[in-house]
Amino acid sequence: DCGTIWHYCGTDQSECCEGWKCSRQLCKYVIDW
């Protein structure tokens, strides 16, 4: 499973769902304009 809000990802971007970014070790939602 992939992670969404506040999911711990460390430095691994693959821990976050598509459309989410690993930021400060947690998954954050990213809006592509």
From Swiss-Prot:
- GO CC terms in record: extracellular region
Keywords noted in UniProt = Amidation, Calcium channel impairing toxin, Disulfide bond, Ion channel impairing toxin, Knottin, Neurotoxin, Potassium channel impairing toxin, Secreted, Toxin, Voltage-gated potassium channel impairing toxin
Annotated GO molecular function terms are: calcium channel regulator activity; ion channel inhibitor activity; potassium channel regulator activity; toxin activity
What is one Pfam family matched by this protein?
Answer: Toxin_12
Q: In which tissues is it expressed?
A: Expressed by the venom gland.
Q: Where in the cell is it found?
A: Secreted
Show the disulfide pairing. Answer: 2-17, 9-22, 16-27
Q: Which InterPro entries match?
A: Huwentoxin-1
- Chief subcellular location equals secreted
Transmembrane segments annotated in the record for this chain: none
Coiled coil location = none
Point out residues bearing the modification Tryptophan amide.
33
Q: What does this protein do?
A: Blocks transient outward voltage-gated potassium channels in rat ventricular myocytes (thus prolonging action-potential duration) and rat Kv4.2/KCNA4 channels expressed in Xenopus oocytes. Is also a weak blocker of calcium channels in rat cerebellar granule cells.
The record's note on its domains: The presence of a 'disulfide through disulfide knot' structurally defines this protein as a knottin.
Family the UniProt entry places it in: Belongs to the neurotoxin 10 (Hwtx-1) family. 21 (HpTx1) subfamily.
Under which name does UniProt file this protein? Kappa-sparatoxin-Hv1a
